Amino acid sequence: MTLNNVTMRQGTVGMQPQQQRWSIPADGRHLMVQKEPHQYSHRNRHSATPEDHCRRSWSSDSTDSVISSESGNTYYRVVLIGEQGVGKSTLANIFAGVHDSMDSDCEVLGEDTYERTLMVDGESATIILLDMWENKGENEWLHDHCMQVGDAYLIVYSITDRASFEKASELRIQLRRARQTEDIPIILVGNKSDLVRCREVSVSEGRTCAVVFDCKFIETSAAVQHNVKELFEGIVRQVRLRRDSKEKNERRLAYQKRKESMPRKARRFWGKIVAKNNKNMAFKLKSKSCHDLSVL
């Protein structure tokens, strides 16, 4: 996944459904539901400083990709939700390059909305990451709208706080009710995985919750940037799997399988055979597959 541009946006326009604006003020009052973001107008950009040469790489091997983007960038609105203090803003800042020296042009226009163009499996995509769940003001109104505007959701909890895990389960139920007729990609994110001695929620509990609520699961550590790259690659793949044609997704899967080891292929093959006649084994396999963000 190769990162290109980053934008953090915060605006002041009124709520007009006709406008295709991604500006979001501090109180979230002007949050808009829109389906197709427009191309953003030209703005002055600030290039990275020379000392930013030690940038952490966020690329997934795509130099030999068999897939190319034929219609330009695709936009995905991804919403961060979860209890306060679980690390949502830290994940957003890492995504935006705040905690990572940048080797590309970037804009800093606000605190709530982050835009980044990246490459996943050889195709360009732009994630517009919304992190306004805890904004002061009309929280109930804002939460309702957050449930409506996302193309995908990251429900974040802290592995050191069981209450945040239980809240994440509640949010999954609320999201299902709000988007009953839609197949929305959701990833349950157990953050702060580096705090091993303070763990209150086990990995198996996270997996089970993901299986029960039909979503994906990953543990991350924003503090040491563990699995953060994989998280944002994964959410792009999850949206694509639901939106794009079967043929296109098969090409992507073939691209990914070329890099898969033979032992892993063998385990996956035999696992499917055993699962056909064993419900308990099928549940275990589904629990394991919830970690795989490249499949539905």
Swiss-Prot record:
GTP binds at residues 82-89, 191-194. Belongs to the small GTPase superfamily. RGK family. The keyword Glycoprotein does not apply. Interacts with calmodulin in a Ca(2+)-dependent manner. Binds ROCK1. Phosphorylated on tyrosine residues. Could be a regulatory protein, possibly participating in receptor-mediated signal transduction at the plasma membrane. Has guanine nucleotide-binding activity but undetectable intrinsic GTPase activity. SMART domains: RAB, RAS, RHO. Keywords: Calmodulin-binding, Cell membrane, GTP-binding, Membrane, Nucleotide-binding, Phosphoprotein. GO terms for cellular component: plasma membrane. Residues 266-285 are annotated as: Calmodulin-binding. Residues 57-68 have a biased composition (Low complexity). It is a peripheral membrane protein. This is GTP-binding protein GEM. It holds the Pfam family Ras. The keyword Manganese does not apply. GO terms for molecular function: calcium channel regulator activity; calmodulin binding; GTP binding; GTPase activity. Residues 1-20, 37-68 are annotated as: Disordered. It is found in: Cell membrane. InterPro entries: P-loop_NTPase (IPR027417), RGK (IPR017358), RGK_GTP-binding_reg (IPR051641), Small_GTP-bd (IPR005225), Small_GTPase (IPR001806).
